[in-house]
Amino acid sequence: MTEQTSTAPPAAPRRRRRWPWVVGIVGGLVLLGALVLAAVLIALSVGGGGFSSSSGSFTEEYVSGEGTDRVAVIPVDGTILSDNSSPEDGLPTTTPRGLESALDQAADDASVGAVVLRVNSPGGGVTPSAEMHRNILDFKAESEKPVVISMADTAASGGYYIATAADSIVAERTTLTGSLGVYIGLLNVSEAADDFGVAQNYIRSGEFKTMGDPLRELSPEEADIFQSIVDEDYEEFVNVISEGRDLPEDEVRDLADGRVYSGLQAEELNLVDRIGGLEDAVEVARDNADLEDDPTVVRYVQEPGLGSLLTSRFLPEPPEVAQLLSASGVQFNGTPQYLYVPGAIRSDLNR
């Protein structure tokens, strides 16, 4: 029997498909990039970046005048928030760090002889309002340059608080100001929670550790504690107005019952010095600083930061209910507020 051998070449080994590995690697890189981008967006959004909300230099926008002396106009727009706040509604806000940065730039510019703060704010947090008040006092003491407040549509509550640090206050006839007082907003959804059978259990270290829980009614003892905080902040507000406006404290208490005043009413009550617009405020600043007749007026402008641009483009909008609450200006975070709530709505609608 003859053995036959094949002369055909051996079959080539079958190549393994590598594309699943490639897809896996690419997918992993895409996922990693998305996570990094999300982390960057969150970090940037926490730092703010809206107008007057972050540190950094401001560009100058020419307003009027031809003189060598200059007056810097610094806008103070929107709700007053702490430096680490991150508003989600896109409304204008202002922070102590942003104001301090603008004032530092004006202090370092030898050609700037005076500053006008154009305030259009319903106020905001007690602490950031006090910080901005100190920023203005520190600027005046260190630079020896006068500061004049020019009130726009709204300069109420915390917006008025910061104004008391200025040398002069000029208000429009139609400005809404006043709302001199403090509140703490606490959300109460206890009835809705009962309807849906929702309850929250706490293991706490003290009787009042969970005071302000929105899932239950506030007890009388808890209300007294919150009221004591409001009373302390109210006394500080009265003291600031009394010192800044040279008014007796008893008279300030009569005025500071939470009501709003028009610009004309505020002038009659000595809460502002005169009626006028931005040009009038510049004139007062010029006279206070003894500048030449036609000083150059520039407005400090800060473009939206990278964080604001990226978050507004890529992050989803909050639910409609959250947007409505935020746009209303109502704060339910349990912290004291120098805030005129209807003023917040008005400021938003006028933009």
Each language-model region and where it sits:
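Hydrophobic/aromatic ligand-binding patch that stacks against planar heteroaromatic rings
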Residues: 161-162, 192
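N-terminal organellar transit peptides
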Residues: 1-148, 154-155, 168-171, 184-351
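Catalytic-core segments of hydrolase enzymes
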Residues: 148-149, 178
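Short alpha-helical basic/polar micro-motif
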Residues: 160-161, 264
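Alpha-helix C-terminal capping segments
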Residues: 162-168
